[in-house]
Amino acid sequence: MDQIFNKVGSYWLGQKANKQFDSVGNDLNSVSTSIEGGTKWLVNKIKGKMQKPLPELLKEYDLPIGIFPGDATNYEFDEETKKLTVLIPSICEVGYKDSSVLKFTTTVTGHLEKGKLTDVEGIKTKVMIWVKVTSISTDASKVYFTAGMKKSRSRDAYEVQRNGLRVDKF
């Protein structure tokens, strides 16, 4: 009789423990979906999901690695919707070797596809005045910025990451 109670008790405790572990896993998943930025990165790391570095992701999608400032290392990328959110520590301007300048706010979002970033929010470029960039696309030798009108620039100017200079406002 003791053996039967032991087996039933062990089975019952095992079932309870599995439910508790499943509950903890579900809690981690719900926490992960309800928080932003670096915290989400940390939760994903705890869960075992490691993100590739931002330059690697950009290269995979055929975009130059220097489009974003060098200190833009935290990002979120939804594989299903292709939404990219890049977190930048402070509003900054980045100058490139072709003398172009981009200004970044602390959160840049867009829709990432092979060779292009569309529906961009959070980037401006200087064309006599600061103009909002709405899309970035590439081919073998050029990067095309759409900011009211489409403007092409030499791709090699954006192949090296550069640091941004902190500015007061976007």
Curated annotation (Swiss-Prot):
Domain of life according to the entry: Eukaryota
Pfam families, A to Z: DUF538 (PF04398)
InterPro entries cross-referenced by the UniProt entry: At5g01610-like, DUF538
Protein name: Uncharacterized protein At5g01610
SUPFAM superfamilies: At5g01610-like
Species assigned in the record: Arabidopsis thaliana (Mouse-ear cress)
Upper taxonomic lineage: Eukaryota, Viridiplantae, Streptophyta, Embryophyta, Tracheophyta
